[in-house]
């Protein structure tokens, strides 16, 4: 029977600077991508119709091309995405380009073009704006609540700020990769970002608790925390990778997006927990306390 063992890393070979520089460079690149996206589009991440308002229609065609699908409608779609199911496409119309065309009119135009409409739904811009406020507000409240809880738990600045910075970096990297991979912000991906906050805090608090409150020297405590934390995170990465692959194969875009965001967020969490957070903890234990 196969057995997985987390290898012990010899952190004494690396200075704090060597550990922290890679996560900080990647965080800087992620923030640059987000800032550039905001300058170019007016939003730090591409938003789906759940937040902007619009119409989404799933049609099955008789071998029509993307150009023919676009020409079938009186307004130009925002996107036409092929689904792995044969000759099935998801046609999206953003509210700002919809020009007041109702979902019933778009459905009728699709049927007149000989397409079979499998599903169609519409989100009004006002409802989308309200949903956006609630969803992003929820992320903000979750992050703020996490920060307060961490400071109450440890009551020491450096270990607490290490957890908060690591969680922030996980979110920033995930959002930047959403832009790069063309994943829209939706209620599903907002849920994925909330889960990333949870995973990040879990692994960071596990490390901090072992180092600050358990017996044993720094490196022994670190390895004990890594055995649990790395195993937990790798298991989640494998599970989310399988979910994303299966969802992609069956054309379930929402689950594919959630799985992809979680996979990259958890990979970022491994880096930030055991490089960024650990380097700050080691500085605190060996230099900060001495001061």
From Swiss-Prot:
Subcellular localization, as worded in the UniProt entry: Cell membrane
Q: Does the keyword Cell membrane apply?
A: yes
Q: What's the main place this protein lives? A: membrane
Listed Pfam families: SecD_SecF_C (PF02355)
Signal peptide boundaries: none
Give the residue spans that cross the bilayer: 19-39, 134-154, 156-176, 187-209, 226-246, 256-278
Bilayer topology: Multi-pass membrane protein
Q: Which GO terms describe its biological process?
A: intracellular protein transmembrane transport; protein targeting
Entry keyword set: Cell membrane, Membrane, Protein transport, Translocation, Transmembrane, Transmembrane helix, Transport
Give the superkingdom in one word: Archaea
Q: Give Gene Ontology CC terms.
A: plasma membrane
Question: Would I find Transmembrane among this entry's keywords?
Answer: yes
Q: Which family does it belong to?
A: Belongs to the SecD/SecF family. SecF subfamily.
Known partners and oligomeric status: Part of the protein translocation apparatus. Forms a complex with SecD.
| Protein role | Involved in protein export.
Q: Report what the protein is called.
A: Protein-export membrane protein SecF
Identify the species of origin: Haloquadratum walsbyi (strain DSM 16790 / HBSQ001)
Question: Taxonomic classification, please?
Answer: Archaea, Methanobacteriati, Methanobacteriota, Stenosarchaea group, Halobacteria
| Gene name of the record | secF
């Amino acid at each position: 029977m196969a057995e997985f063992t987390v290898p012990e890393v010899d952190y004494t070979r690396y200075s704090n600077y060597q550990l922290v520089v890679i996560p900080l460079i990647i965080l800087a690149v992620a923030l640059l991508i987000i800032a550039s996206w905001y300058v170019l589009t007016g939003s730090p991440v591409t938003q789906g119709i759940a937040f902007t308002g619009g119409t989404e229609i799933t049609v099955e065609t008789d071998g029509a091309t993307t150009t023919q699908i676009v020409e079938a409608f009186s307004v130009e779609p925002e996107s036409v995405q092929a689904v792995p199911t044969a000759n099935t496409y998801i046609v999206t119309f953003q509210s700002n380009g919809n020009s007041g065309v109702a979902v019933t009119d778009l459905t009728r135009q699709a049927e007149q073009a000989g397409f079979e409409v499998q599903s169609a739904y519409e989100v009004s811009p006002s409802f989308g704006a309200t949903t956006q406020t609630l969803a992003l507000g929820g992320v903000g409240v979750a992050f703020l609540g996490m920060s307060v809880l961490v400071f109450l738990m440890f009551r020491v600045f450096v270990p607490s700020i290490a957890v908060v910075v690591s969680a922030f970096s996980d979110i920033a990297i995930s959002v930047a990769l959403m832009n790069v991979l063309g994943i829209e912000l939706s209620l599903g991906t907002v849920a994925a970002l909330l889960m990333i906050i949870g995973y990040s805090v879990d692994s960071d608090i596990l490390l901090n608790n072992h180092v600050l409150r358990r017996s044993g020297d720094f490196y022994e405590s670190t390895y004990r925390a890594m055995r649990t934390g790395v195993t937990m995170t790798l298991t989640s990465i494998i599970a989310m990778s399988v979910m994303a692959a299966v969802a992609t194969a069956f054309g379930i875009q929402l689950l594919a997006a959630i799985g992809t965001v979680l996979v990259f967020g958890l990979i970022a969490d491994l880096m930030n927990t055991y490089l960024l957070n650990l380097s700050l903890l080691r500085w605190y234990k060996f230099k900060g306390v001495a001061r």
